[in-house]
Design a protein with these regions (language model features):
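A sequence-level detector for short glycine-anchored, His/Arg-bearing signature motifs
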Residues: 1
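Conserved segment of the helicase C-terminal RecA-like domain
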Residues: 4-5
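C-terminal catalytic or substrate-handling cores of phosphate/nucleotide-
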Residues: 9-172
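C-terminal accessory/interaction regions of large nucleic acid-associated machines
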Residues: 155-206
Length: 206
């Protein structure tokens, strides 16, 4: 039996991804599985790291762009991490204002909202606002400030939260306007007591 093996070595990530895509066309590998390797997400990971650089260790958050990316670092707790799945879900809920769609698999969300999400011309601050607010909401549920009943309605609470603080609609095609919107959300979210009061309002509205 003759077995032919081809070894391809490259430092070009885009080329590597193209090769893997081509090789796996015959396998059940969704195009969306490569989303996290796009430059947008690499840039966003660095953006998150830059924003939280001066935060206390407890308040820092981390974008786990690759599966188990931070598993070898015991100083980073699970509750400080968010992934592509979380980001896609709650961006659809908070920014696109479609919380009823947020429970769907990220492959569906990425495919169906590809013209509205993870675009290279988008400001990264609104994505950070989504992630930080999501993890803050998780914390409030974990610490029993918000009852577990609302676990299944997190997407709805996040949408209401963003609308209360930022306004009815965000223009992601206008960087200055989008950043202003995100800053309004983050100004409250950075203050845990203020975030609690706002989520109380969200629950009353809900």
């Amino acid at each position: 039996i003759t077995l032919v093996i081809k070894i391809i070595s490259t430092n070009n990530n885009e080329l590597s991804n193209d090769i893997v895509r081509g090789t796996n066309r015959q396998n059940i590998v969704m195009e969306e599985a490569f989303e996290g390797t796009r430059q947008f997400h690499k840039n966003f990971e660095q953006f998150v790291n830059n924003v939280v650089a001066d935060f206390s260790d407890k308040e820092k958050i981390y974008y786990e762009r690759r599966s188990k990316q931070y598993s070898d670092n015991p100083n980073i707790k699970q509750y400080q991490k968010f992934n592509l799945h979380n980001l896609a879900q709650f961006y659809v809920a908070a920014i696109l204002q479609k919380p009823h769609k947020a429970h769907l698999h990220e492959s569906y969300l990425i495919k169906n909202y590809k013209t509205s999400m993870f675009l290279d011309n988008h400001s990264q601050l609104p994505y950070f606002a989504v992630a930080y607010t999501f993890l803050t909401l998780e914390r409030l549920i974990r610490e029993h400030f918000i009852t577990k009943y609302f676990i299944k309605y997190k997407a709805h609470l996040l949408m209401i939260y963003f609308r209360l603080l930022g306004g009815k609609q965000i223009d992601m095609n206008n960087e200055r306007s989008a950043d202003k919107y995100a800053d309004k959300v983050l100004k409250t979210t950075y203050n845990l007591e203020a975030a609690k009061k706002t989520f109380e309002q969200c629950i009353e509205i809900f």
